[in-house]
């Protein structure tokens, strides 16, 4: 089977894991005035890509993906625990747990994931999103680059949806923003695949946005 179908499936915003419920701090950045228009939105997203995702989140996921594909369950355990420990706020931790749980439910209801993958995923209580994403890649026979590119696109599509609902950003403007960010996605994905998973980074602005969102008076999203 052509792997493009599995990659599109994993990257789709229609994947029933609840990603539309979360803004990952972007709604707080809008409320605080850090993001005001398409230009400042692009700055925020590029910073997230370059300073957080490409340097820590994605390399960690890439390591977990590689371990999952070859069945190195000890390495999977270590990477999953590191991902869990790196959630800096209650909202970000809850987001990862909820989406991971939903993706595990989906994989348990479908036939593709093999017995070793099912057994490992069942031991994660609860699973985080990175752990479940890695098992989806194993189930649908995606390599690390394919599964990671699906993850990057899923993230970008979600962020654009948040902007269209809250900035507000029109559909055409959102597509223009997406076009300008595609080279950044390429660079971030390539850097993540090169970086060792043991390296790290810190995105203090994201953590602060997430913390302030917990007490934000009016909000549409859960993070």
PLM feature spans:
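Metal- and O2-centered redox machinery and metal/ROS homeostasis
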Residues: 1-223
């Amino acid at each position: 089977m052509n792997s493009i179908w599995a990659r599109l499936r994993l990257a789709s915003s229609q994947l029933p894991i609840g990603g539309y419920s979360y803004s990952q701090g972007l709604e707080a950045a809008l409320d605080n005035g850090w993001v005001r228009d398409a230009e400042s939105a692009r700055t925020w997203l590029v910073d997230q890509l370059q300073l957080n995702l490409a340097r820590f989140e994605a390399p960690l996921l890439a390591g977990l993906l590689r371990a999952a594909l070859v069945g190195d369950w000890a390495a999977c355990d270590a990477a999953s625990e590191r991902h869990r420990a790196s959630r800096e706020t209650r909202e970000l931790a809850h987001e990862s747990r909820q989406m991971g749980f939903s993706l595990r439910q989906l994989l348990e209801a479908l036939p593709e994931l093999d017995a070793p993958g099912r057994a490992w995923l069942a031991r994660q209580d609860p699973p985080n999103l990175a752990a479940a994403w890695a098992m989806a890649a194993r189930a649908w026979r995606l390599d690390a680059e394919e599964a990671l590119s699906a993850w990057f696109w899923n993230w970008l599509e979600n962020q654009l949806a948040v902007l269209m609902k809250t900035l507000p950003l029109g559909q055409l403007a959102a597509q223009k923003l997406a076009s300008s960010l595609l080279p950044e996605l390429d660079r971030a994905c390539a850097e993540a695949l090169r970086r060792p998973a043991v390296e790290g980074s810190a995105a203090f602005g994201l953590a602060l946005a997430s913390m302030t969102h917990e007490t934000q008076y009016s909000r549409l999203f859960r993070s």
